[in-house]
Amino acid sequence: MRYYAEPVGRLIEELSKLPGVGPKTAQRLAFHLLHVPRNEAVALAKAIVEAHDKTLYCSVCTNLTDRDPCRICSDANRDRAVICVVEEPRDVVAVEKTREYRGHYHVLHGALSPIEGVGPEQLRISQLMARLADPELKEVIVATNPTVEGEATAAYLARLIKPMGVKVTRIAHGLPVGGDLEYADQVTLLRAMEGRREL
């Protein structure tokens, strides 16, 4: 039995393909979009198509960009001695929001996951290895997520990079600011203890 007009059903189906959007949220979004003025709906559709058509991968760091090389790789004020390796473009945004890191990046576009069929060939590891030939490069910061896949990726990268004479570091993991010890899991507490520093 069809509950929606065919165009509405198609819209709900397409929206439900977005990550984190289930059928109910897709339905809610679809009905919201049908209630906004037509010009707003058209502006959203145009923004999606334009982002899809005009976004490309930086030939240096493989981050998403609208120009090549990207603004970060083109910035002469960035520290070329350090590359921060992240899983996804959104991770670059997260690090940049700290306003503390001034080095370069490399985006892998995923993490090693044999169960999901993601091996080194599916990630942008070969491009990273090519960048290690830069004589200015002194350190690679591995900032993959603290998941099983992220840890496996970090260990794999360390094995590849260390023999090349480049320092490899891993971001610290630990308790979030405002978090209570009693609610932390054992792995998080262990990492917090291992990553302690002198006051």
From Swiss-Prot:
**InterPro entries from the UniProt entry:** DNA_Rcmb_RecR (IPR000093), Hlx-hairpin-Hlx_DNA-bd_motif (IPR003583), Rcmb_RecR (IPR023627), Rcmb_RecR_Znf (IPR015967), TOPRIM_dom (IPR006171), TOPRIM_RecR (IPR034137)
- A Gene Ontology MF term for this entry? zinc ion binding
Report C4-type zinc finger ranges: 58-73
Q: Secretion signal: which residues? A: none
Q: Its GO biological process terms?
A: DNA recombination; DNA repair
Q: Which Pfam families match?
A: RecR_C, RecR_HhH, RecR_ZnF, Toprim_4
UniProt xrefs under PROSITE patterns: RECR, TOPRIM
Tell me the ranges covered by the Toprim domain, including all copies. 81-176
SMART domains noted in UniProt = HhH1, TOPRIM
Keyword vocabulary terms for this entry: DNA damage, DNA recombination, DNA repair, Metal-binding, Zinc, Zinc-finger
Q: Which family does it belong to?
A: Belongs to the RecR family.
Q: Which NCBIfam families match?
A: recR (TIGR00615)
Q: Briefly state the protein's biological role.
A: May play a role in DNA repair. It seems to be involved in an RecBC-independent recombinational process of DNA repair. It may act with RecF and RecO.
Q: What is this protein called?
A: Recombination protein RecR
